[in-house]
Amino acid sequence: MIIRRFTENDAEKVSALIIRTEKTTNSKDYSEEWINAFEKRAQPSDMIERATWTHFYVVEDNDTIIGCGAIGPYWGSETESSLFNIFVSPEYQGKGIGRKIIETLEQDEYFLRAKRIEIPASITAVNFYRKLGYDFKNGVDRPDEEQMYRLEKFRYTDNP
């Protein structure tokens, strides 16, 4: 298994992975309408666009993409970052791959320069992120209007 940076050639496979995971794993927490709307925002062109302003990673096992995740600036901030598109293929869930993706993102320069990191967490994944030290933003422990939990982690650094 290797973790490497996303390339444009990965866009189709990453899009398919994300959509399949939403339909398989997240379907217990979200309506079909919500998942269909999400699918429209997870097309290959969306993955390519996301990679222009984030550091986007993929996880490969025997040349098959089995996971992905990205980190980038939070609304252009130099001191805040956000995690995006963290997905693991349903067959590989529960095997530590999601944790490896988070560890990779937490070693990225966008994480290391940030004092605060935010993640829009699905209902399905909120407990996973909480185990890794992310807590409810402003203490709000319910989904927002997008049906996502807003989680955050603070880093105490010497950065200005």
Describe the role of every protein-language-model region.
Residues 88, 94-107, 131:
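Conserved acetyl-CoA-binding loop-helix of GNAT-fold acetyltransferases
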Residues 19-45:
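Conserved GNAT-fold acetyl-CoA-binding loop/helix
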Residues 118-120, 130, 135-152:
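Conserved catalytic-core motifs of GNAT/GCN5-like acyltransferases
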Residues 73-84, 93, 112, 143-148:
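A conserved beta-turn-beta hairpin within the catalytic core of GNAT-like acetyltransferases
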Residues 109-122:
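Conserved GNAT acetyl-CoA-binding A-motif
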Residues 42-58, 82:
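A short helix-loop-beta-strand connector motif used in the catalytic cores of GNAT acetyltransferases and
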Residues 58, 64-73, 82, 87:
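Conserved beta-strand in the GNAT
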Residues 2-16:
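A short beta-loop-alpha structural element at the N-terminal edge
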